[in-house]
């Protein structure tokens, strides 16, 4: 087992009050009679909300050593033994996230986010990007940069949620990752994300019964059909297998 080195505890490096103040300032700016008419104000709001979404898991990734985790995120509030996908794991518990580590190597296996700085951060960022582009298409390059960063983070979170067994939430995360890339023309939508969302929603539907199952299967079907209408097809054709199960 890897050696645990836990010096005097310090909090996860997320300054919640500071981040909330940034969001409040961005909200106030777009509500201002003059500043709200500027696309740049909406770009800034999109950036603030995207950054707040990303921050709690910004330094995480599978295979990162515990020592690097502690250096970048801080020391955990505590640690305990658990399991990850049925295998032994050591959990480093932080304010915003529980990080699962391989006991043999000390490498990150996965994580589960427990808190968000604010609700609907990614969705608000996407809405703000769309508003900014509507007001001034010349802001496209700035918007595209935010959209790509946010989409990558959402897809990574989708993987993390799926690894923890949160299938429906993972599906939504992949769908939002796809939507982030549809705001401006220069970001090419990743239909793999849409396929992942449909696949996960179909898997989730199979665990339900009655009207809930019907609604979830219908949602999966819609996602698959949207992907197919764009000309998308996964490498081995599994999209048709999952689509069949939606009927």
Give, region by region, the residue ranges found by the protein language model.
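Bacterial Sec-dependent N-terminal signal peptides
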Residues: 1-19
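Alpha-helical, heptad-rich or low-complexity scaffold/stalk segments
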Residues: 29-32, 38-51, 55
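Acidic, serine/threonine- and glycine-rich low-complexity intrinsically disordered segments
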Residues: 179-247
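Short coil/linker segments at helix-helix boundaries
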Residues: 48-168, 172, 176, 181-189, ...
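Structural recognition of alpha-solenoid helical scaffolds
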Residues: 18, 22, 150-157, 193, ...
């Amino acid at each position: 087992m890897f050696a645990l080195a836990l010096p005097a505890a310090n909090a996860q490096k997320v300054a919640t009050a500071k981040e909330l103040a940034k969001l409040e300032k961005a909200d106030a700016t777009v509500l201002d009679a003059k500043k709200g008419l500027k696309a740049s104000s909406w770009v800034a709001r999109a950036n603030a909300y995207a950054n707040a979404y990303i921050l709690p898991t910004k330094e995480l990734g599978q295979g990162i050593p515990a020592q690097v985790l502690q250096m970048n995120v801080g020391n955990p509030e505590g640690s305990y033994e658990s399991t990850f996908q049925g295998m032994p794991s050591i959990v480093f518990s932080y304010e915003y996230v529980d990080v699962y580590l391989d006991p043999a190597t000390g490498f990150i296996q996965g994580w589960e986010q427990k808190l968000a700085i604010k609700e609907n951060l990614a969705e608000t960022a996407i809405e703000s990007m769309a508003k900014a582009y509507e007001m001034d298409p010349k802001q496209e390059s700035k918007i595209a940069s935010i959209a790509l960063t946010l989409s990558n983070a959402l897809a990574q979170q989708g993987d993390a949620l799926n690894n923890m067994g949160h299938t429906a939430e993972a599906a939504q995360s992949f769908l939002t990752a796809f939507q982030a890339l549809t705001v401006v023309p220069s970001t090419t939508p990743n239909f793999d994300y849409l396929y992942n969302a449909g696949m996960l929603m179909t898997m989730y539907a199979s665990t339900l019964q009655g009207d809930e199952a019907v609604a979830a299967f219908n949602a999966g079907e819609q996602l698959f059909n949207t992907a197919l209408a764009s000309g998308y097809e996964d490498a081995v054709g599994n999209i048709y297998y999952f689509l069949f199960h939606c009927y």
